[in-house]
Amino acid sequence: MNRLQVLAVASLALLSGLAPQLCAQDFEALAKDVAQELAGRQYDKVEARFDATMASAMPLEKLQTFWDATAAQVGALKTVKSARSVETQGYHVVTLACDFEKAPLNLRLVFDKDGKVAGFFLVPPEAAWNPPDYANPSAFHEEHVTIGAEPWQLPGTLTEPIGAGPFPAVVLVQGSGPNDEDESVGSNKPFKDLAWGLASRGIIVLRYEKRTHKYAAQYKKEMGNLTVKEEVIDDARAAVALLAGRPEVQKARTFVLGHSLGGMLAPRIAEGDNQIAGIIIMAGSTRPFGQIVVEQIKYLASLSGPVGDGAKPQIGAAEKFAQDYDSPSLKLGDTVSMMGIPLPAAYVLDLRSYDPAATAARLTIPMLVLQGESDYQVTRKDLEGWEKALAGHKNVTIKTYPGLCHLFIPAGNPPSPADYDKPSHVARGTLDDIANWVAAQRTP
């Protein structure tokens, strides 16, 4: 499954809330009907179930493009094994555990009170999380905190070492999509791994629910004006400000760790914020987003052998996205279709105007750049952007990790989306390097 595509769907299929009138069993039955229609490629029937916002965001052609791209990666939907539902913000969210030909995936559908589909996306199946062996739960405690101000306050968790402080601190910033505070992907929780592992080494860690996860309903109406400032940057800086007011946090030793999109944006978060003592970039991209999407789609298509006619529509759609993404005529109010998923022009134009490597080069704070050598999403080409821009900086450390994928967990051979479905943990070597680097950054 194309994880970039899944994250985009999760990011853009945002929900709104009204009181439900149907019962849980009704919504589960509706969800199974939708799954059956998708499996049968009855796209017109699926589209007829959409609410007005969903119908506008994913019309028939885009729905077909999305589902065909899914089938190209994981095969046809074979069976629905189980269904579970939960009410959230007045909507009913139904998760169907599905078996596709090549991999299990959960189909998650969101219904309004009238049974209309307000959003849907595919996610890896969940499994129980167990602590990594480098975490020592007796060495720390956790406290629930609130980040930011109304109307966008976010729940977070402060993982704090036991003992006499003050301690250095790290803020964790997630990648694309509406992530929870653990940046959960299936049974993997890389941010929980980092929080527990670093706190076991004497470092305070703050992680929090992403705004587009907590306030999905509100942001459905705000998507046309959404940029990474609202999605990521404002809340990361609010988290830094919260730590600055905590007596157990050592002054001038608060760091920002960003992963994926968070890594790409880490220099922008730090620029102009003198409370940030340094940044850690994990799998942060430096190249244009459209270029990365094309490269990724071609790679995923190649996993099944020589690229045949079946993959050409998906590759063509990716290339069309890259062309539209870079279009000089793109203006506010427009949308760009990414494999059937509409991205608002405000979001695209904001990303286009940002050069992560050049921004990093303007910083004088210490930086740690980490890259998995088996990452097919953010690759060696992106790392070269950091290396070139930061070549003259003596306070920059760059490390790569053989055999690790985008989540800094072991990758398969060849690396594939299936790697994210296997329960694992952020590699000990990566955790050790982060902890040692933070410990080495002393106040002037």
Regions found by a protein language model. Name each.
Residues L363, V369-Q371:
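Short beta-strand/loop motif that positions the catalytic acidic residue
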Residues L172-E231, K298-A301, I409-Y420:
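Cap/lid segment of the alpha/beta-hydrolase catalytic domain
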Residues G278-R362, G392:
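Accessory cap/linker subdomain of secreted extracellular hydrolases
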Residues A127-G165:
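N-terminal cap/lid segment of alpha/beta-hydrolase-fold proteins
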Residues E28-A29, D44-G90:
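Short solvent-exposed beta->alpha transition segments
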Residues E248-S260:
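Alpha/beta-hydrolase fold nucleophile elbow
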Residues N225-P247:
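Alpha/beta-hydrolase active-site loop
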Residues L404-L407, G412-P444:
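Catalytic active-site module of serine/aspartate enzymes centered on a nucleophile-bearing elbow/loop
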